[in-house]
Amino acid sequence: MTIGGDEEFMRRLHRCPEHIRKIFQSIDAYLVGLDDVTTRIDKKQEGRTYYRGGKWFCRMDPKPVEAWIGVRIHGVDPAVIETVAKVRDRPNDPHWIFVKDPGKVTDLKRMLRMAYESRTGSD
């Protein structure tokens, strides 16, 4: 279930190159297929955050101009995430990766599953 309007977000996604849209759609379909997952589009309609039991475990921001997807994954060691893509810290918001290689989707889904499973506790 998506909370919040996503028309502008969908326009943003459709401005991305086809391979970026396919990466996003593949990961999105995987995540929303997991039990107890809700999503929310941010206020600027630039990204989608995924929640389990009210706790976020992933955020994806497709970037049409840069031709990559910014992904933030909760609870997975940055060294493990580095196996998929280089971790880049944003000011006040560390541990983002920029995904543009469709060949990394399977590994990324594995890490997202770890983040999803980490959200069963009370953190």
Where are these predicted regions, by residue range?
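A short, surface-exposed helix-loop junction/capping segment
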Residues: 1-16
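Residues that form generic nucleotide/phosphate-binding pockets
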Residues: 12, 30, 111, 115
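Charge-dense, low-complexity intrinsically disordered segments
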Residues: 14, 18, 99-102
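Amphipathic alpha-helical segments
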Residues: 17-38
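Short, conserved beta-strand/beta-arch hydrophobic-aromatic motifs that form part
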Residues: 39-96
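Well-ordered alpha/beta subsegment
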Residues: 89-123
